[in-house]
Amino acid sequence: MALVAPAATRAVLFGPSQDDAFFPDPVHLIGKDFMVATVEQLYAAWIPGPILGIETSCDETAASVLATDGAVLSNIITSQHAVHRRFGGVVPELASRAHIESIEDVSSEALRQSGLTWADLTGIAVTQGPGLAGALLVGVNYAKALAYILKIPAVGVSHLDGHIASAWLQDPEFPLPCVVLVVSGGHTHLYFKESSGHCRLLGSTRDDAAGEAFDKGAQMLGLEYPGGPAIDRMARQGNPAAIAFPRSYLKKGSLDFSFSGLKTALLYTLQAMPEESRVARAADLAASYQEAIVAVLVEKSFAAVRSSGARALAVVGGVSANSRLRALLQQRATRESLDLSLPPLAYCTDNAAMIAAAGRQALRAGLRAPLDMDAQPSLASSFAHTI
């Protein structure tokens, strides 16, 4: 059971809030951080205005400015794919260095494209976790320095909360309650988001995330990093029914995921094939492997919708950019007359607009980060609790 700060506790620590429903469980601010915050930080009222979001959890350096009403004024992303491609995956030390080199320019460009000045900002939101420790520290320290210089509040938010918030960036009126699938390189989680804004964790991966399965599968197939988009492109030329890869649904009624067995099945399939067959059937291998992943994601998501009684589904995170997943979700949602939210591709992968959106909710709820806020590489979603 995750820690929960009830409204009464928040009222004592942060003053009365009119927006508790938007940020019900500030897990990442419970503990010693409360003890070191100044009285001014705890009780300072936030006057809604433009805010800057900063994201450095993995291999994208991103900054975004949201207007007073939450509209996205800019969304700048600098990718490190060229840095990590020759290693076949993210090298944490190189990621941290690249963030240091890029963060000031990315933030300045986000501000320039927004048409605002530093003096116009009223708050800063930064990814506090989960993610790579060194990468997170770059963003957290930069955000704290800006907040101190500009004399405006900062707030640390969960990367998972950012992905959840991205579902409402394009369509603020997307209905609640709904089921949210967060599917990325590091996470595969199903949540039930209540009308209050509170989330309940319905299921998660027991081993590898879907994005991890895509990346490792791409490596085995000899495709370039990042693996997800590479498999997506290759699969368009293949037959998704060519090879019967296993699909793990676990026990009946389970909303958890497991992709480790699928990776092993691909490995054994490739080992049993002559080299010329691997090359000749590369597209079929990619398409069949992809189908085994996305079919489970779709089936579990709609099972969660049925069991929860919701009539809406939001799918967010980097893997939500997969073209086959999007097509299957749209077909199923149409057939079952469900509302479906698939964020634009710019909001699927790691970005700072989603961090700013989650941070805006936190600031409206009265949350503030002290100046000794630290990165939390294992930070869970602070919107959610487990049941």
Indicate where each model-derived feature is located.
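A short helix-loop
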Residues: 38-51, 57, 64, 74, ...
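Conserved phosphate-binding/catalytic loops in two-lobed NTP-binding clefts
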Residues: 156-157, 313, 330-354
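Glycine-rich phosphate-binding/hydrolytic loop that grips phosphoryl groups
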Residues: 343-381
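N-terminal beta-alpha supersecondary unit
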Residues: 48-130, 159, 285
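Intrinsically disordered, low-complexity segments enriched in serine/proline and basic residues
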Residues: 2-12, 24, 124
